[in-house]
Amino acid sequence: MLMTKPPVPQLNLTAVHEAAERAARAIPPLWPLESSVAVNPFLGQIGEPLAVAAARLRRVAGAAVTMPRAWYAERIASGELSDVDLAAAIDAATPTTRPLTIAELKRAAQMEIAPPQALPTVADLASAVSGFDWTGFVAERISAWASGYFDRGQALWAAPKGPNAYAAWRLTATHDLTPEIFSITGFAADVAAAPESADAALIRAVEQLGLSEAASESYFHRLLVGLGGWAQLARYRLWQAELSGSTDTTVTDLLAVRAVWDSALLRKYQPQIAAEWTDAINGYAQPLQPTEDDQINAILQDAVERAAQRKLQTVLTASSQPKPEDRPALQMAFCIDVRSEPFRRALESLDPRIRTLGFGGFFGLPIAHRRFASDVVEARLPVLLPPRVTTSCSGHTHAHEANDRAKRVAARAKRAWGRFKLAAISSFAFVESMGPVYVAKLLSDGLRPGTRTTNTDPVPQFDPPLALGARVDTAEAVLRAMSLTGPFAPLVLIAGHGASVVNNPHASALHCGACGGFPGDVNARLLAGLLNDPEVRTALAGRDIAIPADTLFVGALHDTTTDAVTLYDADHHSPAHAAALAQTRDWLATAGALTRSERALRLPRAATGGAIARRARDWAEVRPEWALAGCRAFIAAPRSHTSGRDLQGQAFLHDYDWRKDTDFSVLELILTAPVVVASWISLQYYGSTVAPETFGAGNKLLHNVTGGIGVVEGNGGLLRSGLPWQSVHDGERLVHQPLRLSVLIEAPHEAISTILDRYPEVRALFDNGWMHLLALDDNGRMHWRYGGDGGWERADNPPANQRVASFE
């Protein structure tokens, strides 16, 4: 039977291609496991407010963007969410859609609403009329091909690549008889007859499906969301290409592949689903319009976040012991990561002469690094930036060269052994014969107290070396950005951070996000070396940064899983600092013990801090640490505003003194780099909590690595992105409360506005409510609140129209 389709006007090919490009950019990127970093799952929706994003993601993903109503009702009933918070959220909402009274909002919170439903694809409709899961079948066939195409060396037989993803899929699909076996007659022949380019194939599929131009973008977005992590991995390729000034077509190639499948299924089931498919096309073509429930959910979410800000204000205004003004005995710079906050608080409590500060964990060094005995280049910087400097740990001595050769031989042997274990002809025999050998290692790792294997690479160095002028400029820029221009302690530690876990495919996600998913030790050691350089210090003195001759900078690594700190003092041998280093090691050990005891209260089955190290080496432990769960605030201000306050490991802390930032260049850096990185982290946790099926990685217990790039649940299926459920839930309750990030900055709000005007993509995050922005006064109190569209309102003295009485 010939397939008939609804009549549509002549397609505007340019419009269809533009719709495909917009749909591709609505998908967030997914970094491979080796350098996994947190990504904002709403990256493609930052140009629209939460309620509009809710309407869009309901249409294309069937996903919620807020919690169930009962979650808000519980907080109202407990008093955590007060009438003041509800009133303020109502007042901030769009006047034409907000409920009139607090009472109405409370009643709405008591009413559960239907879960969101996505518009159907042809595969969905075919599944409904046939009783066969065509949606799952299509996902399985695409995943089977994609896991080979994107493979990074895990597969023993390489899949055909072709010049691009679409061409590679055609090579496979024209020989794959699985669709024929499952009754899609002529599928392979149809693929063979399809156009050779993805663009032409997509146009052909659009014509066969009878899509209108108005429906194309939403339909394309729907198909890409249905591909899960595969579409996001393709989006990563586009992201990386654009960082280097080129482009990549893998996302639209996958879109064409998925559209061909729908076209084939429509040919088979058109008589049964014609009317439903026409309705679906009309639904895709409708303008986005948030419902009343979308608006109410957005108001309730805003109210919960205002309640959290009110609680944070109470903590920040609590009194604390002032620090003495004399020269500190120890200064220690940490990454702004929320996991450093409890350690910093514990360390400072040991001696009033200890100062800590926070800065982005790549420490201002945008490096592409090659480790010792390796040719792999690691981008150890925020994924928002391209590397600008190359570094290595190659070393030049005879001993280093011999060690390099030995490590390379060992690495090759390890790879060969791994391939032997996985080979089709040897894998079963391997398990039978060699399995008992691994019992000793399992017992050793499970029972022996955990000790982290530290990085023993030679001292990292700029390769090629930087000229003196570049070294001085870099050192000055970093010190001023850290607000570290004096006085300097005799010992200054630059501490990156990493994690020590075993049997965890997402291990890189526990490392430093500002270092691209790698530990921060290399950046810390490089900066320490730069600041110990006598020529650099001499030049810095001429720029009003005088570093005393007795000040030693030492790189360090904070293990966030065990709270042990490794010092790389051997990089800069200094007998004069032996006593200071010994005292510092004692302080660090004590601070680590205090921090572990605090963290043990939150970790399941970790009654004491002593259990932390054991958990780090437990192959069966799914929660070795909580990582950044609980993150809710970013504070850029002098440390005096947060020192001594218990922020419960929930705040990113960036030292910043606007009085030293005469041209506000440091403020610009903060708003455009660490704030954006923190938003990605915060919103990944948010998305993985409110919609774990769509934005989360599923059950960690079922994860299998595929292609060396990502995880699937079980033995196949779609690539999963986001956080595993165990990263936000302890088995009984949520440990991460889904709150959009509150950004608190001590700086004139006019200066903040000026910078936002120069960066529309950053401003969009605040204009559309994906983050809150508050300006602090000189005492650390929330003084101004950003209201969107460049406007500010007083945060400490609500206007009359925010009074609770006006809504009752």
From Swiss-Prot:
Locations listed in the record: Cell inner membrane
Predominant location: membrane
Alphabetically ordered keywords of this record: Cell inner membrane, Cell membrane, Membrane, Metal-binding, Transport, Zinc
Molecular function GO labels: zinc ion binding
Names of required cofactors: Zn(2+)
Domain of life: Bacteria
Binding positions for Zn(2+) per the UniProt entry: 335, 337, 497, 512
Membrane topology recorded in Swiss-Prot or TrEMBL: Peripheral membrane protein
Disulfide-linked positions: none
One CC-aspect GO term: plasma membrane
Function: Part of an energy-coupled inorganic carbon pump.
HAMAP family hit by this protein: DabA
Family the entry assigns: Belongs to the inorganic carbon transporter (TC 9.A.2) DabA family.
Subunit structure: Forms a complex with DabB.
Protein name, UniProt field: Probable inorganic carbon transporter subunit DabA
